[in-house]
């Protein structure tokens, strides 16, 4: 069982060393879940004397006003009889104190280091471990004494500040409250009882200690309180008799003081029947036993909390990404890895592993065909325009059989309108590829970590897509131009010819420009244009995929990688500049994760040894 108190001691020290003081923060706290005994009392309640009686040493700063200005985590370790007593501070890990006057001075000095030589308070605890054959295994947290007024040099808020600090400790469900009250004052005015009642109204977590019993007015006693009639708690009240100021001035040692305390309770008629559960020795043993019991009952819940929090911390650290490398090679490698991750996510969108690539197919299967169908050839193939172009094409010599030049001009003027849908298809795919770049950037966690790199990768990707768009537009429009530049002769050869039995055309020269003849030309040209549209409907997507989609998959960041290899370390560093808030958060998370893993290892070691 003693291993359990030692276990909590180790975890408490780790908490303080790694910055977990149980304060409200954006980080999970282990400190608040650890069972502890918090010592609470007013400034004149005898709180310090009780602690020194439990330890058996003079070691706490004394004086008027607020002497305890930081929480003191006092960890007592019982060692073998005959061993020399010593003390250690967490902030001085390799220094042993055998002179307890020096311990008192170090407590005062360490307090001043945190608060300055003022009368301010701080919630950052001091950890003091005392090793002695004359103590029980126990951990106590000495809190600043409650006060009702601020003294000179203290802010007006000091009364509330101390109450808030004390309350922040004792309101935790795993905290045992050691409420120190002087017997020579009305219990109804006890600062310790008042604040403990606020957070523990049933008294299940509160242990009452009554001091200054020997200083009560003659004819009065504390029997009603000690027997639980005046104020009932779950645990019996414990009375103690501390050294008087005269004893302290005369350096009366603790062994003699404990002996006189025992004699007082055994010889005083009012308390004789309670003597076996009175005194600082009984208090220390009772607290040690109770703390062991509480720790044992809380360990499973603490283990569960630790495991859950470790998983949460690891997940958040993964989201925040790794810290930046210091050397140029490490920075370059980090940038390349991030870019490769982004590039793979972009490819996954195109290949259907992630959503979005299907929209490109929609351009080819719906948008382009619909645009081709919407083309209007009324102007090019109107009777007036057909007559005009055929007449102009004939020049001064009318055509003999078929107006070939007129056909060519009419077909070319019609096919040229296909450039619009072709360009629109290229632009639509370009827009979709840019959207996929932005999606891939938002899904690449490491790019969120480095805003500068995110901007550069985004700009480089868009630049590449624009070059690919321009090349795709050139190649795609070239397909249209090729259709305009060379007609499919077989289409016209397969058309039926109107000739008489003698092999002569049925139309005379004079009726070649009538409406029926012109209408037939228009119908023929429209059929040819529709055939070309059907061909381009399949060849335009091929050109776009080859020039844009395939090329984006193959070389989206090639130009950026070329430039990256030329960059100096200063430029590389600028790309990996992080938001300072993220850097601070990662550092804090790493320290907190170290704490939880350390606690996990300590608990596992104790469980293994049992």
From Swiss-Prot:
Any GO molecular function: GTPase activity
Binding sites annotated in the UniProt record for GTP: 44-49, 212-217, 242-245
CDD domains, per database record: DLP_1
Gene Ontology process terms (BP): cell division; receptor-mediated endocytosis
Stretches the record annotates as G5 motif: 241-244
Keyword Hydrolase listed: yes
Region (G2 motif): 67-69
SMART domains: DYNc, GED
Location of the region described as G3 motif in the Swiss-Prot/TrEMBL record: 142-145
GO cellular component, as recorded: cytoplasm; microtubule; phragmoplast; plasma membrane
Domain Dynamin-type G: 31-300
Region G1 motif, residue ranges: 41-48
Alphabetical list of SUPFAM superfamilies matching this protein: P-loop containing nucleoside triphosphate hydrolases
Region of interest: G4 motif: 211-214
Annotated GED domain residues: 518-610
Alphabetically ordered keywords of this record: Cell cycle, Cell division, Cytoplasm, Cytoskeleton, GTP-binding, Hydrolase, Microtubule, Motor protein, Nucleotide-binding
Tissue specificity field: Expressed in seedling root tips and root elongation zones, young root nodules and young leaves.
Compartments (UniProt record): Cytoplasm, Cytoskeleton, Phragmoplast
Family: Belongs to the TRAFAC class dynamin-like GTPase superfamily. Dynamin/Fzo/YdjA family.
Any further remark recorded for this protein: The term phragmoplastin refers to the location of the protein to the phragmoplast across the whole width of the newly formed cell plate, unlike phragmoplast microtubules which are concentrated on the periphery of the forming plate.
Functional description taken from the UniProt entry: Microtubule-associated force-producing protein that is targeted to the forming cell plate during cytokinesis. May be involved in attaching Golgi-derived vesicles to microtubules which direct vesicles to the forming cell plate during cytokinesis. Possesses intrinsic GTPase activity in vitro.
Assembly: May homooligomerize and heterooligomerize. May interact with CALS1 and UGT1.
Protein name: Dynamin-related protein 12A
Species the sequence originates in: Glycine max
UniProt lineage: Eukaryota, Viridiplantae, Streptophyta, Embryophyta, Tracheophyta
């Amino acid at each position: 069982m003693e291993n359990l108190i030692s276990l909590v001691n180790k975890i408490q020290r780790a908490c303080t060393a790694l910055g977990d003081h149980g304060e409200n923060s954006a980080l999970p706290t282990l400190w608040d879940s650890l069972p502890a005994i918090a010592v609470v009392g007013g400034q004149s309640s005898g709180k310090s004397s009780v602690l020194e009686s439990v330890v058996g040493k003079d070691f706490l700063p004394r004086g008027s006003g607020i002497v305890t200005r930081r929480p003191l985590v006092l960890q007592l370790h019982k060692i073998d009889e005959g061993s020399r007593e010593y003390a250690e501070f967490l902030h001085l890990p390799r220094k042993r104190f055998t002179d307890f006057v020096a311990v008192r001075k170090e407590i005062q000095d360490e307090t001043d280091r945190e608060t300055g030589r003022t009368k301010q308070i701080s919630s950052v605890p001091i950890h003091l471990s005392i090793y002695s054959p004359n103590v029980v295994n126990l951990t106590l947290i000495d809190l600043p004494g409650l006060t009702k007024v601020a003294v000179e040099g203290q802010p007006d808020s000091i009364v509330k500040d101390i109450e808030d600090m004390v309350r922040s400790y004792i309101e935790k469900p795993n905290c045992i409250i050691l409420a120190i009250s002087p017997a020579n004052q009305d219990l109804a005015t006890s600062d310790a009882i008042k604040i403990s009642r606020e957070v523990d109204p049933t008294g299940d977590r509160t242990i009452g200690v009554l001091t200054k019993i020997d200083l009560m007015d003659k004819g009065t006693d504390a029997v009603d309180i000690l027997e639980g009639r005046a104020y009932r708690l779950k645990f019996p009240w414990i009375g103690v008799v501390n050294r008087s100021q005269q004893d302290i001035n005369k350096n009366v040692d603790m062994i003699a003081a404990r002996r006189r305390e025992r004699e007082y309770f055994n010889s005083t008629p009012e308390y004789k029947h309670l003597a076996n559960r009175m005194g600082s020795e009984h208090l220390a043993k009772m607290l040690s036993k109770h703390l062991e019991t509480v720790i044992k009952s809380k360990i499973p819940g603490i283990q569960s909390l630790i495991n859950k929090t470790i998983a949460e911390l690891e997940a958040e650290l993964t989201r925040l990404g790794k810290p930046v490398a210091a050397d140029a090679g490490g920075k370059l490698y980090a940038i390349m890895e991030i870019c490769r991750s982004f590039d793979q996510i972009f490819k996954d969108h195109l290949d259907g592993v992630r959503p979005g690539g299907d929209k490109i197919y929609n351009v080819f299967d719906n948008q382009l065909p619909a645009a081709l169908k919407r083309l209007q050839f009324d102007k090019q193939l109107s009777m007036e325009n057909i007559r005009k172009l055929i007449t102009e094409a004939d020049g001064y010599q009318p055509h003999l059989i078929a107006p070939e030049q007129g056909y060519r001009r009419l077909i070319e003027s019609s096919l040229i309108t296909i450039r619009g849908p072709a360009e629109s298809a290229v632009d639509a795919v370009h827009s979709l590829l840019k959207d996929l770049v932005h999606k891939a950037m938002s899904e690449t966690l490491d790019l969120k970590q480095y805003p500068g790199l995110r901007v550069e990768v985004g700009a480089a990707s868009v630049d590449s897509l624009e070059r690919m768009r321009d090349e795709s537009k050139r190649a795609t429009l070239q397909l249209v131009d090729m259709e305009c530049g060379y007609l499919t002769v077989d289409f016209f050869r397969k058309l039926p010819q109107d000739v008489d039995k003698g092999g002569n055309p049925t139309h005379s020269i004079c009726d070649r420009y009538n409406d029926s003849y012109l209408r037939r030309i228009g119908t023929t040209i429209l059929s040819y244009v529709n055939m070309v549209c059907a061909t381009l409907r399949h060849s335009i997507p091929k050109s776009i995929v080859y020039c844009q989609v395939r090329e984006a998959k193959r070389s989206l960041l090639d130009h950026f990688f070329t430039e990256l290899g030329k960059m100096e370390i200063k430029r590389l560093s600028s790309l990996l500049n992080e938001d300072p808030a993220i850097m601070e958060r990662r550092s804090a998370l790493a320290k907190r994760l170290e704490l939880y893993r350390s606690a996990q290892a300590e608990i596992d070691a104790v469980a293994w040894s049992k």
